[in-house]
Amino acid sequence: MEPWLWCERYSIPDRIEPELMTDTQYTHGHHESVLRSHRWRTADNSAEYLLPHLRSGMSLLDIGCGPGTITIDLAKRLAPGRVTGVDPCADVIAQATAAGAGESTVEFRVGDVYDLAAAVAPASGYDVVHAHQVLQHLADPVAALREMRRVCRPGGLVAARDADYAAMAWYPRPPALNNWLELYQQVARSNGAEPDGGRHLRSWAHRAGFSQVTSSASVWCFSTEQERQWWGSLWADRVTSSDFAEQATTRGFADEQQLTEIATGWRNWAADPDAWFAVLNGEILCRA
């Protein structure tokens, strides 16, 4: 089968309704190629829209904290305020706990965004509840935002930032990367997720009951040789070795040869000195 015929041969619903999903499978999984990108994230490169609103002494809950780099960065800024990171993956929480061992104001717990009882909120609620690249992966992001609001103090902030895959831009545009985008969207939506979540954040917040919502957007750009090699190699590895690869093949969206062709396309793209990639991220600040 030719790679450009994937979408014609394999059709799936545009959206799997949340009520049909009891759990959402994480599209990326926790392969090293995934965690490599997660560990790159900091408050400066991933939460700049939130930083002007933070003050020393604030309490903060970080949803889907992963290996904890953003969480720990935020804890340093908010000390002596308490910062808690939660993630459903116990192995990743163990990594985050080890990384934050030297910070007395941060702790990590296994937790579920739909039921944040494990977060042990302060009596009055957290000053800030934050989620980075989380809502796009959920079957019911509106329910998640409601739960985030529940553990936020009245007048506090609920903040979220998510990529929008359909709005990503790159040059040059080899067929392999176009096929990658189509395949990623197929796999993500088969998990009940919304890969173009960035554009939906404002709507989701309104549906969750927020009336004061400030929207913004920002971009990650990869263009230097080091940036291209890092971005291209991690996606080449994800395409062939992560949970995404397993989901794509077991569900009949692609075979191993097609995944190898996409991975080669990523490496060839990264080697081109003219190459450039931009990831658009939607952002919201919601007053609880």
Label each region the model flagged.
Residues 142-157:
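A short glycine-rich, Lys/Arg-flanked "PGG" loop and its adjoining helix->strand segment in the class I
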Residues 159-229:
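Conserved catalytic/acceptor-binding region of the Class I
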Residues 127-140:
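A short SAM/SAH-binding and catalytic strip from SAM-dependent methyltransferases
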Residues 115-129:
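A short acidic, Gly/Pro-enriched loop at the edge of an enzyme's catalytic core
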Residues 40-56, 73:
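Conserved alpha-helix/loop element of class I SAM-dependent methyltransferases that forms part
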Residues 212-288:
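Conserved Class I S-adenosyl-L-methionine
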Residues 61-63, 67-116:
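Class I SAM-dependent methyltransferase SAM/SAH-binding core
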Residues 22-42:
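Class I SAM-dependent methyltransferase Rossmann-like catalytic core
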